[in-house]
């Protein structure tokens, strides 16, 4: 896995909280032969979504009730369906011929959204994790706002047909 993000939805407070688990975090990977300690991002290769969920549950000591697997193509397609999402760049960089300047606001979609979420060469994995959470939050924020409700059927349809989801 490129990124593992745990999301907690608190409906009564209308809040969504996210944490990223660094991909190089060593933990028990229960699906690996012999159940050994390995990088958590290897759990997907050993047993897919279910193995990753088990590894995250063991690491955090909490139950994961629902999951979504986002692939690179999903970031491209979902942000395209939604007409882009708004972000404020957390770092200045160029990735895949896409340039971002720290502190500037952008509406990103498609390959530009993917470039923003994948960059880590000139800053850090932590900044990249922050960008990934930022794009996820922007997708959620747009879908729950009245102006974004029109995108919900297209996003839902795409997720049902093309993505690994459990909810």
Role assignments for model-derived ranges:
Residues 1-167:
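Non-catalytic, solvent-exposed segments at the cell envelope interface
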